[in-house]
């Protein structure tokens, strides 16, 4: 399990629609170059590079350097940790709402 700071960084990275779309584009498992991603998102190279750096710093993607080409691949383990955190808290809130609903039913005249 990742630290709280690492999860914070993950959720900050995922807060941006373009970065979530990049994660989706990489979800197929194939490594993609920054240029390929830039063409897909119709963004300038510096913008794409900044988004990729945020994702890389959050450990959501990893970089593979092949000469001058930098390819990026999704790191599924980081997404799994974030998903596990969400599921744990979802279970808590679902249980709390169910308990509240039961209490309210018991209080009805």
Feature annotation, model-predicted:
Residues 2-46, 69-80, 84:
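N-terminal helix-turn-helix DNA-binding core of bacterial DNA-binding proteins
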Residues 1-6, 27-28, 80-109:
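Amphipathic alpha-helical dimerization/coiled-coil segments
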Residues 57-67, 73:
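Beta-hairpin "wing" of winged helix-turn-helix
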Residues 24, 56, 62, 94, ...:
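A cross-family signal for key residues in well-ordered alpha-helices
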Residues 38-39, 50, 56-57:
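Alpha-helical residues within the helix-turn-helix
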């Amino acid at each position: 399990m990742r630290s709280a700071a690492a999860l914070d960084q993950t959720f900050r990275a995922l807060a941006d629609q373009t970065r979530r779309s990049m994660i989706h584009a990489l979800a197929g498992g194939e490594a993609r170059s920054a240029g390929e991603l830039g063409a897909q998102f119709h963004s300038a190279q510096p913008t794409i590079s900044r988004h990729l750096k945020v994702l890389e710093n959050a450990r959501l993607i990893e970089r593979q350097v092949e000469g001058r080409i930098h390819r990026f691949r999704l790191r599924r383990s980081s997404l799994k940790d974030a998903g596990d955190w969400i599921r744990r808290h979802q279970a808590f809130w679902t249980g709390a709402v169910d308990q509240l609903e039961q209490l309210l039913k018991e209080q009805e005249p």
